[in-house]
Amino acid sequence: MAYQYHNDLLAPYLALSQGDKVQAEYVWIDGDGGLRSKTMTMTKKTTDIGQLRIWDFDGSSTNQAPGGDSDVYLRPAAIFKDPFRGGDNILVLAETFNNDGTPNRTNHRHHTKKVMDLAKDSVPWFGLEQEYTLFDADGTPFGWPKGGFPGPQGPYYCGAGTGKVFARDLIEAHYRACLYAGVNISGINAEVMPSQWEFQVGPCEGISMGDHLWMARYLLVRIAEQWGIKVSFHPKPLAGDWNGAGCHTNYSTKVMREPGGMKYIDEAIEKLSKRHAEHIAVYGEDNDLRLTGRHETGHIGDFSSGVANRGASIRVPRHVAAQGYGYLEDRRPASNIDPYRVTGIIVETTVLDK
């Protein structure tokens, strides 16, 4: 049986005064692409990243260092408000570094920050559509009949009503927590497969896109923990005639967003077509199970683009084509991407001409 939170028992303790002390929850990406966190007591409130101390953790327990040299360092990168503790308490997204000062192998933010700094005059904006699937503690899709299947896809996308959507309370809690924390969440919707949902984050400029998506993920898995529900970011969590889960990446630069920008959108698509294999390599593990040419995807081995075509690698929204400027949507990234790697390679390809 899964452990259930006792929010009623916890509530009176969270209401106690902290005095002048503040709790800072340091959050980082582990060696397997998951999320970890631990808490530090601070002596005063801060909103300045420079006032936060560098911390460390046991990297041998997170697949980030050997046991004989296990210290990995946490360097604060972004601050968010803490929706779990409230008050002046904060969440600190941190980068991981080895003891020699080099970025840990899972620290993709470090490289992408350099890329975004080089491309800052282009003002790259991103909006990511994070799909995910909910599972019961026993590993069955949340809300599905035990030992069976729900009806075929059709009524679930943006659905309303019993039997069409599952765990809306969890999703609403996550939405509000993101807004409170300062995550630039822009929307939510139920997805095509039952118990699959999506939230959107953005527009965010440059490196902040990865920061905000990772923190939104952290909030989601923490809240799901309270519900006793598991969150899967696998791109094809269930075999068969069910949609996979992606992280569609909407992208533009300053010139694309201005009148006449369609020319630059077309140029970006041409550049992306020439590095399809390099992009697929960082667009998520097991993405071949999702990019089959079915279920609103293009085939992983082919590059394609089109207006309003959800079966293409790159989709240009119809309103963008009609007005002649705006953005493109890269539909290839899987739900389990590292957003730093994806946003970084898109800018490298389209702005820095790698």
Curated annotation (Swiss-Prot):
Is Lyase among this UniProt entry's keywords? no
* UniProt keyword list: ATP-binding, Cytoplasm, Ligase, Nucleotide-binding
According to its UniProt record, this protein's enzyme class is ligase
Q: Name the InterPro entries on file.
A: Gln_synt_N, Gln_synt_N_sf, Gln_synth/guanido_kin_cat_dom, Gln_synth_cat_dom, Gln_synth_gly_rich_site, Gln_synth_N_conserv_site, Glutamine_Synthetase
Enzyme Commission numbers on file: 6.3.1.2
A molecular function (GO) term:
ATP binding
Coarse class of the protein's main subcellular location: cytoplasm
Q: Which Gene3D superfamilies match?
A: Glutamine synthetase, N-terminal domain, Glutamine synthetase/guanido kinase, catalytic domain
| Xref: Pfam families | Gln-synt_C, Gln-synt_N
Q: Which PROSITE patterns match?
A: GLNA_1, GLNA_ATP, GS_BETA_GRASP, GS_CATALYTIC
The biological process GO terms on file are:
glutamine biosynthetic process
Per UniProt, residues of the GS beta-grasp domain are: 22-101
Protein localization: Cytoplasm
Q: Which residues form the GS catalytic domain?
A: 108-354
Tell me yes or no: is Nucleotide-binding among this UniProt entry's keywords.
yes
- Give me the reactions it catalyses: L-glutamate + NH4(+) + ATP = L-glutamine + ADP + phosphate + H(+)
Q: Which family does it belong to?
A: Belongs to the glutamine synthetase family.
Quaternary assembly: Homooctamer.
Q: What is this protein called?
A: Glutamine synthetase
Organism field: Suillus bovinus
**Gene of this entry:** GLNA
